[in-house]
């Protein structure tokens, strides 16, 4: 059980606003009011929420209103998050924390930051100018109202700005890193052709070029980016149809699940209004043979979803699309990085993008009297994670799915 190091707040004289029973004791400009809002109230709060996303310490496209509201509306009622928001003394929104309570029968006793099944991150949006105070106000609110042993901050970038702020807040609390891994990312600088050798995949780069030539012999190949709301609407339908034509048709294609298909249509359209989404396509004589949905926030991009025509597997259209996306991203400038949103050791993207970003799940205890319960909760959470990973490995061996 690890604890993040920090000088004791009482010794340093530093004070964070604390809310117990709704009492405001903070300075007017400090985060002082934490409250739970319904989905309807969050919808009405969309303009303030969008403004917060632009001021956020750590960007997260999956917690912006276009994505989060669409996801919450179209998931089963039992899986919908509770939205905890923090405001400062002037009423300005400084934090949005969607949470889900542990299952009373089979849960591990930890409140979780909401990670939708279609999301790759669960980093809360907090104002960069008062991030530690906002995080503390959230923890105090939960501690005063919930019986859970701790809060699980799931899927956040390791050593990212939010993670660093969390480290500064949790002195005196028990902390456990329940999971951590690295996934492929595209960092700025250099040329696309230089990435293969850096990844130790020089032969793979040569194979990509050979497959591109073979694809070009079949017809006119074009790479297109769709970013207006009208273009996104049409491209989303093409994506859903392309995805459903392949192996995902029997392993959970979005088009086969009406709620998820509606969610994707809604999220991409709403994000496009804020320049937060684009859909890229590789086309053969005008027909889409590979498509990717890319989310964007504060200079970061998220390669969220990819679909490709499996009848052209020998020409690897999915890899050709990622390679074209890589060139476009590196040539575009103003890039923080592109998150692959992939699993660790992904057999395709890892051979193209040599850089990695860390992602971690960090559990933080609530209350000094709950440490034993917190440790037990962490043990249960680890046991459940290991069981899920074992089940996934077994399923993948049985299915023997190929990646292209």
Give the label of every model feature segment.
Residues 119-121, 220, 359:
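Short, solvent-exposed beta-strand edge segments and adjacent coil->beta transition regions
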Residues 139-141, 198-206, 376-384:
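Short intrinsically disordered coil segments
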Residues 31-112, 155-183, 190-314:
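A conserved beta-strand-loop-helix scaffold within acyl/acetyltransferase catalytic domains
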Residues 79-81, 146-150, 277, 333-338:
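Short, high-confidence coil segments that cap the C-terminus of an alpha-helix
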Residues 2-33, 164-194, 333-404:
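Active-site/acyl-donor-binding loops of N-acyltransferases
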Residues 116-147:
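A gly/proline- and charged-residue-enriched helix-loop-helix capping module
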Residues 143-161:
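ATP-hydrolysis module of ASCE/P-loop NTPase motor domains
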Residues 88, 127, 133-140, 254-371:
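Aromatic (often tryptophan-rich) hydrophobic motifs at membrane interfaces
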């Amino acid at each position: 059980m690890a604890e993040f190091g920090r000088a004791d707040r009482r010794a340093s004289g530093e004070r964070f606003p604390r809310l117990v029973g709704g009492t405001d004791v903070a300075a007017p400009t400090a985060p002082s009011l934490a409250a739970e809002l319904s989905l309807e109230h969050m919808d009405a709060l969309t303009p303030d929420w969008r403004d917060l996303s632009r001021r956020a310490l750590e960007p997260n496209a999956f917690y912006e209103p276009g994505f989060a509201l669409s996801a919450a509306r179209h998931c089963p009622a039992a899986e919908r998050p509770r939205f905890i928001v923090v405001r400062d003394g002037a009423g300005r929104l400084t934090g949005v924390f969607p949470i889900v309570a542990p299952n009373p029968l089979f849960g591990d006793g930890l409140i979780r930051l909401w990670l939708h099944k279609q999301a790759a991150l669960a980093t809360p949006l907090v104002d960069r100018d008062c991030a530690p105070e906002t995080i503390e106000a959230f923890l105090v609110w939960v501690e005063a109202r919930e019986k859970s042993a701790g809060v699980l901050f799931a899927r956040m970038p390791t050593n990212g700005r939010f993670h660093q702020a969390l480290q500064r807040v949790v002195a005196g609390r028990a902390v456990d890193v329940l999971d951590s891994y690295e996934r492929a990312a595209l960092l700025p600088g250099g040329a696309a052709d230089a990435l293969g050798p850096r990844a130790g995949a020089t032969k793979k780069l040569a194979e990509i070029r050979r497959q591109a030539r073979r694809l070009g012999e079949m017809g006119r190949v074009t790479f297109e980016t769709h970013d207006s709301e009208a273009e996104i609407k049409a491209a989303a339908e093409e994506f859903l149809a392309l995805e459903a034509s392949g192996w995902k048709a029997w392993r959970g294609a979005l088009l086969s699940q009406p709620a998820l298909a509606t969610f994707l249509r809604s999220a991409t359209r709403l994000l496009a209004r804020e320049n937060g989404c684009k859909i890229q396509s590789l086309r053969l004589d005008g027909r889409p043979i590979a498509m990717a949905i890319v989310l964007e926030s504060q200079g970061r991009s998220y390669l969220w979803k990819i679909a490709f025509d499996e009848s052209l597997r020998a020409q690897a259209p999915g890899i050709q699309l990622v390679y074209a996306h890589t060139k476009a991203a590196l040539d575009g400038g103003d890039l923080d990085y592109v998150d692959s949103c992939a699993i660790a050791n992904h057999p395709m993207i890892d051979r193209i993008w040599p850089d990695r970003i860390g992602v971690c799940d960090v559990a933080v205890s609530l209350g000094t009297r709950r440490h034993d319960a917190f440790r037990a909760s962490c043990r249960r959470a680890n046991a459940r994670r290991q069981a899920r990973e074992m089940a996934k490995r077994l399923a993948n061996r049985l299915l023997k799915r190929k990646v292209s």
